[in-house]
Amino acid sequence: MNIVLKLETKERQQLAEKYKSYEQVSKNPYITFFAKVGKTSISVYTSGKVVFQGNEAEKLASDFGHIAQVVPQKQTNLIGTDEVGNGSYFGGLMVTASFVSEENLNFLKEIGVADSKKLTDEKICQIAPKLIDRIPHVALVVEPAKYNEVIASGYNAVSIKVALHNQAIYLLEKQLGHKPENIVIDAFTTEANYKKYVNKEQNHPLTKVTLLTKAEDQFLAVAVSSIISRYLFLENLKKLSKESGFTLPSGAGNLSDKIAAQIIKSQGVDALNQLAKLHFANTQKAIKIAQL
């Protein structure tokens, strides 16, 4: 486990004093203090950042302001969110928030809800319409042109996702008319980073948000959101392929570069604004290929 804290000078001095008997030499020029407590290391950086790494990280960091994360124990009365499209050059970005109640638990298990990455696209296209029809949810679809506009306005790849997850949760809470017991986000950034960006947003959910890695494997609500988001992404990619006259691939590999280069040659570089996330490195690679 990794926990990162930003401590003041006095707090860093207190930490160094507390663990001076565990101090070891670090070859990293940016580390001012390094200690090994059992199997857990503590690294204090010149920037003021302190990294606790190991199985006792949470326990050691709790003495310096870290609040241990409480993982929800129930599957129901819970909102879960997930996004799809953030790693694909072509296509938009889809973020879904879904609410799972006790009455829908058996239904979800019967139709085989699982993380979308574990399901074939064919299975997703079978399941997703049933989920959309029955499960309370809010899905936000950001087309490439809108995505590029938002990025150009000052957002980055992380802050745009924070804004969308936050808004989807906020709108779903309003739709439900009551507070869920828990809200779980499939973690795509650190909790500190999430808080930094979400504090800049206008709307905020009433319920505390928990960020968990691999949450789609632990909570059905997150798995539902994963499936709906994946379905919407596939539909969006299909629509954009039809409009452009090119079969647009998912992902951000070499094939994306080659297809983008073909689009540039036939329609001009501006055509990519409607089809792809321009800040990806694929854009410049495609321009170079198109010039060959």
Swiss-Prot record:
EC number(s) given by UniProt: 3.1.26.4
List GO BP terms, alphabetically: DNA replication, removal of RNA primer; mismatch repair
Positions annotated to bind a divalent metal cation: 82-83, 186
Gene Ontology molecular function, alphabetical: magnesium ion binding; RNA binding; RNA-DNA hybrid ribonuclease activity
Name one cellular component (GO) term.
Answer: cytoplasm
For this UniProt record, the keywords arranged alphabetically read as follows: Cytoplasm, Endonuclease, Hydrolase, Magnesium, Metal-binding, Nuclease
UniProt cross-references to CDD domains, sorted A to Z: RNase_HII_bacteria_HIII_like, RNAse_HIII_N
Subcellular location per UniProt equals: Cytoplasm
Enumerate the cofactors the protein uses.
Mn(2+); Mg(2+)
- Reaction(s) catalysed (UniProt annotation): Endonucleolytic cleavage to 5'-phosphomonoester
Superkingdom to which the source organism belongs: Bacteria
Q: Does Cytoplasm appear among the keywords?
A: yes
Q: Where is the RNase H type-2 domain?
A: 76-292
> Where would you say this protein principally sits, based on its record?
cytoplasm
SUPFAM superfamilies assigned to the protein according to its UniProt record, in alphabetical order: Ribonuclease H-like
Q: How is the cofactor bound?
A: Manganese or magnesium. Binds 1 divalent metal ion per monomer in the absence of substrate. May bind a second metal ion after substrate binding.
The cross-references to InterPro entries, in alphabetical order and at most eight, read: RNase_HII/HIII, RNase_HII/HIII_dom, RNase_HIII, RNase_HIII_N, RNaseH-like_sf, RNaseH_sf, TBP_dom_sf
**Can the keyword Membrane be found in this entry's annotation?**
no
Q: What does this protein do?
A: Endonuclease that specifically degrades the RNA of RNA-DNA hybrids.
- Spell out the family assignment given in the record's similarity comment: Belongs to the RNase HII family. RnhC subfamily.
| UniProt name for this protein | Ribonuclease HIII
> From which organism does this entry originate?
Lactococcus lactis subsp. lactis (strain IL1403) (Streptococcus lactis)
Please state the gene responsible for encoding this protein: rnhC
